[in-house]
């Protein structure tokens, strides 16, 4: 039993380290991009510090999103939870809202196409069935 717990703990630690490495890599890439645009440099310590702060903020975001969903008696986080999280940053909230509306519009268009396709298929199958009935009557 203890060995299982230790193995799970080790897997969790390994997963956490991979996540931290991914955040560190992404922060490093963004810092390189900013450095080339602004003609400046970031030290490795600065990149590491930004990475740590970013990872910590992501952990806080995840906990907040879970709490928002739980408060609404849901087990799934939805866009309303994300909007609530972003409420203090007006530009971010605006961006998220616009993207959400774009996605909703695309979903409506897909639904309409699917409905039209089903109606066309139903119409074709009814027409072919009627044609078959006419042939058998003759």
From Swiss-Prot:
It comes from the Eukaryota. Keywords: Acetylation, Cell cycle, Cell division, Centromere, Chromosome, DNA damage, DNA repair, DNA-binding, Kinetochore, Mitosis, Nucleus. It holds the Pfam family CENP-S. GO terms for biological process: cell division; DNA damage response; DNA repair; replication fork processing; resolution of meiotic recombination intermediates. The modification N-acetylmethionine is found at residue 1. It is found in: Nucleus; Chromosome, Centromere; Chromosome, Centromere, Kinetochore. InterPro entries: CENP-S/Mhf1, Histone-fold. Residues 112-138 are annotated as: Disordered. The keyword Translocase does not apply. Its main location: nucleus. Gene3D superfamilies: Histone, subunit A. The keyword Nucleus applies. GO terms for cellular component: FANCM-MHF complex; Fanconi anaemia nuclear complex; kinetochore. DNA-binding component of the Fanconi anemia (FA) core complex. Required for the normal activation of the FA pathway, leading to monoubiquitination of the FANCI-FANCD2 complex in response to DNA damage, cellular resistance to DNA cross-linking drugs, and prevention of chromosomal breakage. In complex with CENPX (MHF heterodimer), crucial cofactor for FANCM in both binding and ATP-dependent remodeling of DNA. Stabilizes FANCM. In complex with CENPX and FANCM (but not other FANC proteins), rapidly recruited to blocked forks and promotes gene conversion at blocked replication forks. PANTHER family: CENTROMERE PROTEIN S, CORTISTATIN. Belongs to the TAF9 family. CENP-S/MHF1 subfamily. Heterodimer with CENPX, sometimes called MHF; this interaction stabilizes both partners. MHF heterodimers can assemble to form tetrameric structures. MHF also coassemble with CENPT-CENPW heterodimers at centromeres to form the tetrameric CENP-T-W-S-X complex. Forms a discrete complex with FANCM and CENPX, called FANCM-MHF; this interaction, probably mediated by direct binding between CENPS and FANCM, leads to synergistic activation of double-stranded DNA binding and strongly stimulates FANCM-mediated DNA remodeling. This is Centromere protein S.
């Amino acid at each position: 039993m203890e060995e299982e717990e230790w193995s799970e703990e080790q897997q969790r630690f390994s997963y956490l380290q991979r996540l931290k490495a991914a955040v560190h890599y992404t922060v490093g890439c963004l810092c390189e991009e900013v450095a080339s645009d602004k003609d400046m440099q970031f030290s490795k310590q600065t990149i590491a510090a930004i990475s740590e702060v970013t990872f910590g903020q992501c952990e806080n975001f995840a906990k907040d999103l879970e709490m928002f969903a739980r408060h609404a008696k849901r087990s799934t986080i939805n866009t309303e939870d994300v909007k609530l999280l972003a409420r203090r940053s007006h530009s971010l909230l605006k961006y998220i809202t616009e993207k959400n509306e774009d996605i909703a519009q695309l979903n409506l268009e897909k639904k309409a196409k699917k409905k039209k396709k089903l109606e066309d298929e139903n119409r074709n199958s009814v027409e072919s069935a009627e044609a078959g009935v006419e042939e058998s009557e003759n």
